Amino acid sequence: MKRIFEVDPWTVTSHDLNPEDKRLQESMTSLGNEYMGMRGMFEEVYSGDTHQGIYVGGVWFPDKTRVGWWKNGYPLYFGKAINALNYVKADIYVDGNQVDLAKNDVTDFEVSLDMKNGVLNRTFTVFGVTFKITRLVSAAVKELADIHYDLSSADGQAHKIRFDASIDADVVNEDSNYDEKFWQVLDAGNDTDSSFIATQTIENPFGVPQFT
């Protein structure tokens, strides 16, 4: 495996923001608590190559096999662990400029997975603002994930921050055999303090139960 992280007994740390290593970086900074897990993809928009993935244990879909007529002995479907809703998605602007580390002039970048405490930390500076982002999935409450943002001015100037957070059910699996989207939205809503979305896996012709 290509080494892009520093050697340390308990932390997986990198200061490298190389687009060619982005997927490896995401894989190596994944989080999980035996109930759900997620890759170390960025919360904010990233227009470069990335592989977003959030998964819930036991939730899968029978993806119809795609083979030619000459193939014999293949199953009718392959059980696929499908991407769950993206609940970490955020669109962030500094003084009207969209935060996108694939395009921005980024300094002081660091991503570090604390293996002892199960916490992912990321720091970077763009547009005169330093971002410190902490993410975890709870070991005590299996359905709980937490993301904390700490923003500070790096240039001594005042900045206007726009933060659009969302729960995204329009997710895909890159390796789906027929480019299907496996979730359908049943209900959604929000108020001043919270938002929710209820989804269910789409119907399938194989008698596999649908997950909600």
Question: Where are each of the predicted segments found?
Answer:
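Beta-sandwich/jelly-roll carbohydrate-recognition scaffolds of carbohydrate-active enzymes
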Residues: 2-212
